[in-house]
Amino acid sequence: MNAPRFLQLHRPDDAALAAEAAAGLLQPAAAVSPKFLYDALGSRLFDAITELDEYYPTRTEAGIFAAHGEAIAAAVRAATGPAPILVDVGAGDGTKAARLFARLQPRRYVAVDISVDYLRGALACLGREHPGIEMLGLGLDFSAGLALPGGVADEPALVFYPGSSIGNFAPAAARQLIADMRRSSCGGAVLLGVDLVKASSRLEAAYDDALGVTAAFNLNLLRRLNTLLGADFQLRQWQHVALFDAAQSRIEMHLQARVALQVRWAGGERRFEAGERIHTENSYKWTTAGFAALLAEAGFGAQCHWTDPAGDFAVFVAC
């Protein structure tokens, strides 16, 4: 077995992150990037969210792969040929991509996440389980664009972005990221998970569960800002809000002040009135026709998709 290789292309800069977060808090309508949700505790809380009854995307996507796995793999192989390079964007622990290994038999697995530190344990484990696959971990902040270094995917590859994460991007930004994926595939294919439009009550329940795990996930952002900025957010003074904006076809997550309060941090402060919000995340929901049009706008000429029987979720292959 070859040992996994790691390349950190993006160096997290706490000073730059702090400046970005502070600037967001000082906007007329305060907003902070959802990337601040995912510190170590936030990532564990999100893993717990995926197991909740209300949060259907993870299990529904898994059901689509179980029901249609061979057809999906055949569509990928038609574009990439046998033994493709598999580029896993936002890889995390790599478990979703690993489910593709048996059918696709990739010769190289490229796990992309913001820090290679998140990838070391996962790739060591996957390397032991799949000694015939070359393992490469890339530390890359793809939220500002996906550009792979030379030699990583220099032949037709599959770019894999599951779990409806594409919904965290506004349509124009999603189109640009998908165009980046198309270039990175080197004439291969992309495989994406897409959450579909449905009743607002189900969407809001998925982002505001009865156990309060999603609320804890959102409130943990304030804990992160306290550490990053030296701020004095009091978590009990805030509440989690999730709502569906039908006009923009997106779920929004906010943190809402329960009372009027003043927040201070190194170099800044802001007063929040009772009911005032900090916007923390969007998750756009698509129709299959709308997402197919987005793929075409990003440059893909051929595509196919599969859904669950209820039409809650879709998996797209485009080339």
Predicted features along the sequence, with ranges:
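N-terminal auxiliary segments of SAM/dcSAM-dependent transferases
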Residues: M1-F36, S43
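Class I SAM-dependent methyltransferase Rossmann-like catalytic core
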Residues: A29-V76
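Conserved class I S-adenosyl-L-methionine
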Residues: G81-G92
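Conserved SAM-binding loop of SAM-dependent methyltransferases across substrates and taxa
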Residues: D93-Q105
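Class I SAM-dependent methyltransferase SAM/SAH-binding core
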Residues: A102-G145
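A short glycine-rich, Lys/Arg-flanked "PGG" loop and its adjoining helix->strand segment in the class I
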Residues: R175-G187
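Conserved beta-strand signature within the Rossmann-like core of class I S-adenosyl-L-methionine
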Residues: S184-V197
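Substrate-binding/catalytic lobe of Class I Rossmann-like enzymes that use SAM or dcSAM, i.e.
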Residues: E204-Y284, T288, A292-A298
